[in-house]
C-alpha cells in the first residue's frame, strides 16, 4: 500500500514539475513575442512619415499650471504620442479602415524632472502587451518599472528598479501592474474616441422649451463672453503667463485614395477650486487641413458657474475655391435662437452642437 501511495505521489510531483516547466516555457515565449513586437513597433515609429508615406499619429500636449504662490508656480507639462495603423478599409466601397493604436509614449515634466511612460499594444487586436515607466520625484527618488501582460490583461512578468538597483514590487508605491494596465486601457479608450467614433455624432439632449430670456440680451451676453474668452486666451498664450491648455494634433490618412488630413484641437480651461477642484473648459477651437481644403471652428462655452453648455459656434471653411461661414447662437437650454450662414450652405445648428458635445467628450476622457 505504501508503495502505491509513494508511486502516486511521485507521478503527481512529476506532473506538477512538467506543468510548471510548460508554464515557464509559455511565459518565456510570451515575453519573447512581446519583445519582438516592441522592436517592430519601434522600427515603425522611427520610420513614421518617411518613404513618402503619410504619418498616422496623434500628439497631445497639455500644460497645467496652478496659481502663482509661495516660492514657485506648480506646473505639469505633458506630451503624449499615439502611433497607429489603418486596418480593413475599402476605399472603393467608401469604408474607412479601423484605426489601431500599437504604441503610446508619454513624457511629463514635474518638479524639474522629465518622466516617461511607454505602452505597447497588440498591433492587430489592440490589447495591452507591455507598460514601462521611469520617473523621479523632486526629492530625487527614482523608480523604473516594466510590466508584461497576456491577452486577458494578466501580468505575466514584472521588473522593478529603485535608485537604479534591482528591486521588488513592494519596494515602492508609485504604481503596480493593475494601475499601469488601467492607464494603458484609458489611453486606448481615448484613442478610440478620437479616431474610431462613427458619424453622425451622438445627439445632445436639450430642454423642451427655448429660453424666456430676450434674444437681444442673449446675444449681448454671448458676445461679452466671447470677448472675455479671447482676452483670457491672449493672456494664456503669452510667455510667462499662467497656462492651462491642451493641444491635440492628429495626422491621418483614412485610405490610400484619400489625401492626408491634419486636425488640430485646442482647449483652454481654468482651474476651479470650489466646491471641489476641477478643470472647466471655456473655449475650444478646431482647425483641419488637407489638399481638398481647410476649415476652422470655434466653440464657446457658457461662463455661468456649473454650466457646461456650448453657447456659440463659429465655422469657416474653404473648399474648391468657395468660402463658407457659419455662426450659431444657443440659449442655456440648447436651442439655436440665431444663425448666420453663407448662401451656399444650409443651416444645421443641431449637428454642429452634437459635434461640440463629441469634442467635449474627448477632453472629458483626457482630463479624468
Write out the residue ranges for each language-model feature.
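Sec-dependent N-terminal signal peptides
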Residues: 5-18
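Beta-turn initiation residues at beta-strand->coil junctions
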Residues: 105-109, 132-136, 159-162, 285-289, ...
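A short, structured loop/turn motif at beta-sheet edges
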Residues: 121-127, 151, 300-308
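Short helix-loop boundary/capping segments
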Residues: 127, 136-138
